[in-house]
């Protein structure tokens, strides 16, 4: 990754550290810049040994929803501004995209064009989402999206980040190893995205409380997990009217724990089906997906970080 557009894509002095695995550093002083990219030599031989699945890959994995769909990135939609979108579609005033039913390779719909997918660019409304943009769908939706494979067989949690709004809907989530919905199993009870926690606290449904209270939120973090929820990640600031607020402190930014159990390497599909098909204008919103090994959320000595 790079912090400067047009740079070498390697920031000097930044190196990820994993306990028990030192890694192989990049020799940034010897990087070469041919016509079509960059070449970064390594200072040692990089091998895929037992440390990779047992140490390096036993971390929380977070995927922005649009990164799960190749076409969003290869066609320049992900992260686009309103001005860039106008250039793409060659039509002034456009700040959102509506996609054809079979546009995405890793997304399957089960009711044809009744499920409407939309992408709202990051500077259109300043949404309180990760990176400010919003991928959502409307109508009596019923679709499945392919998730990344886990790096190693084991016990994991799957969570979804979303922004609660009264305009949202209510849905049932299913999980399976293929897009064949007859083989999928329901995950927990339906999720009601319409429920917005009160800024003063929401003990009954989500367990959310202002993050500065009760030991800086540590006590209510556990209360939320008992309800099947988590706060938004401390990793990013929200946009829009609440700009400047950390997601963790924003009452609408939530994570729902969808599944906890054994997962094997291989294909993984998640289905989202409305339980309110008559509410055709209600929205489904997916901000990001987290796949988390049990060594992170159930470590015998350490609590999972709030980022």
Explain the meaning of each model-derived region:
Residues 6, 12-19, 45-307:
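Extracytoplasmic
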Residues 21-24, 38, 178:
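Well-ordered beta-strand scaffold positions
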């Amino acid at each position: 990754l790079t912090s400067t557009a047009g740079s070498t894509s390697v920031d000097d002095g930044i190196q990820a550290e994993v306990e028990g695995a030192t890694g192989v550093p990049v020799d940034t002083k010897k990087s070469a810049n041919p016509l079509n990219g960059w070449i970064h030599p390594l200072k040692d031989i990089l091998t895929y040994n037992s440390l990779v699945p047992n140490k390096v890959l036993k971390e929380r994995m977070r995927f922005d929803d649009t990164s799960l769909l190749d076409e969003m990135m290869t066609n320049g939609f992900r992260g686009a501004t309103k001005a860039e979108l106008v250039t793409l579609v060659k039509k002034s005033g456009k700040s959102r995209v509506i996609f054809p039913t079979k546009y995405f390779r890793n997304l399957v719909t089960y009711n044809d064009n009744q499920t409407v997918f939309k992408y709202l660019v990051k500077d259109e409304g300043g949404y309180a989402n990760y990176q400010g943009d919003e991928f959502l769908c409307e109508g009596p939706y019923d679709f499945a999206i392919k998730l990344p494979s886990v790096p190693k067989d084991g016990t994991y949690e799957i969570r979804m980040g979303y922004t609660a709004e009264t305009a949202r809907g209510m849905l049932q989530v299913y999980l399976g190893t293929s897009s064949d919905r007859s083989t999928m199993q329901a995950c927990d009870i339906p999720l009601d995205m319409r429920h917005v926690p009160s800024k003063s606290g929401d003990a009954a449904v989500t367990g959310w409380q202002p993050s500065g209270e009760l030991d800086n939120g540590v006590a209510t973090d556990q209360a939320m997990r008992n309800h099947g929820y988590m706060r938004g990640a401390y990793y990013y600031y929200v946009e829009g009217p609440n700009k400047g607020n950390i997601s963790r402190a924003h009452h609408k930014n939530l994570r729902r724990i969808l599944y906890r159990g054994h997962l094997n390497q291989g294909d993984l599909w998640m289905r989202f089906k409305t339980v309110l098909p008559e509410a055709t204008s209600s929205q489904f919103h997916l901000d990001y997906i987290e796949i988390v090994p049990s060594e992170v959320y159930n470590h015998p000595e350490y609590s999972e970080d709030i980022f």
